[in-house]
């Protein structure tokens, strides 16, 4: 996973670029309990499908959340609902898209007030472009 680093936004929320089914066991070993897909199938040739990743998650006992986004439909139609996914009572969430940028911007939009300001700062420390969240919030 060194070529596709995990960016730890909080103790419970991390983002990264495309995940492969072969990485799921390692993600579980790192304490992740939920994998959230923010990438539509077939965005790039050869990327694993959501069904393939869901099967790998099921095999290893992780929840798989489908919330695919493009820049055209960002942030999707259920930001309030997806906010709950970013606040697990136990375990950790890994959200992924092509680079981690959409996932990080989505997480930022689920935060409010001072927490949102802090979320911008955390994402920007990783070099994540936060323009999508800034334009909407």
Task: Provide a role label for each language-model segment.
Residues 97:
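Short cysteine clusters
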Residues 1-93, 105-137:
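Cys-dependent protein tyrosine phosphatase-like superfamily
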């Amino acid at each position: 996973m060194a070529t596709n680093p995990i960016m730890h936004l909080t103790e419970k929320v991390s983002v990264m670029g495309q995940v492969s089914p072969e990485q799921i066991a390692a993600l579980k070993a790192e304490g992740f309990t939920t994998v959230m897909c923010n990438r539509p199938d077939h965005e790039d040739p050869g990327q694993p499908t959501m069904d393939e990743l869901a099967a790998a998650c099921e095999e290893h006992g992780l929840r798989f959340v489908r919330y695919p986004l493009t820049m055209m439909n960002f942030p999707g139609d259920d930001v309030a609902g997806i906010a709950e996914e970013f606040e697990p009572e136990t375990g950790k969430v890994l959200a992924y898209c092509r680079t981690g940028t959409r996932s990080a911007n989505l997480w930022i939009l689920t935060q409010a007030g001072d927490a949102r300001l802090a979320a911008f700062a955390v994402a920007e420390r990783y070099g994540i472009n936060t323009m999508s969240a800034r334009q909407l919030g």
